[in-house]
């Protein structure tokens, strides 16, 4: 079974070897037929402390690293949001 991969924005990199990634999903409300946005924060393992706040990153499922960390950063996938908007 393939591992799930999610794309999100780093909201915190203050912990050692850990980042917090905000992943946003969209769905159509079943009654109102309106597109609704929901977000969730995931703790992910960042072995080299490479990701910085504001970067768009990909994370994938992995073995549990701790109580909260069951995702890891996909290496070489971080890109700065500010650089892409300019």
From Swiss-Prot:
Task: Tell me which InterPro entries the record gives.
Answer: NA-bd_OB-fold, Ribosomal_uS17, Ribosomal_uS17_bact/chlr
Keyword Phosphoprotein belongs to the record: no
GO terms for cellular component: cytosolic small ribosomal subunit
**Any Gene Ontology biological process:** translation
Q: Which NCBIfam families match?
A: PRK05610.1 (NF004123), uS17_bact (TIGR03635)
* PANTHER family reported in the protein's UniProt record: 40S RIBOSOMAL PROTEIN S11 FAMILY MEMBER, SMALL RIBOSOMAL SUBUNIT PROTEIN US17M
Name the chain's protein. Answer: Small ribosomal subunit protein uS17
Organism per entry: Methylobacterium sp. (strain 4-46)
Organism classification, top ranks?
Bacteria, Pseudomonadati, Pseudomonadota, Alphaproteobacteria, Hyphomicrobiales
């Amino acid at each position: 079974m393939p591992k799930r991969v999610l794309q999100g924005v780093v909201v915190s990199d203050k912990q050692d070897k850990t980042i917090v990634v905000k992943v946003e999903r969209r769905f159509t409300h079943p009654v109102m037929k309106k597109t609704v946005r929901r977000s969730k924060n995931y703790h992910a393992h960042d072995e080299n402390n490479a990701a910085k706040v504001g970067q768009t990153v990909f994370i994938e499922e992995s073995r549990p690293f701790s109580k909260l960390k069951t995702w890891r950063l996909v290496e070489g996938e971080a890109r700065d949001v500010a650089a892409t908007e300019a």
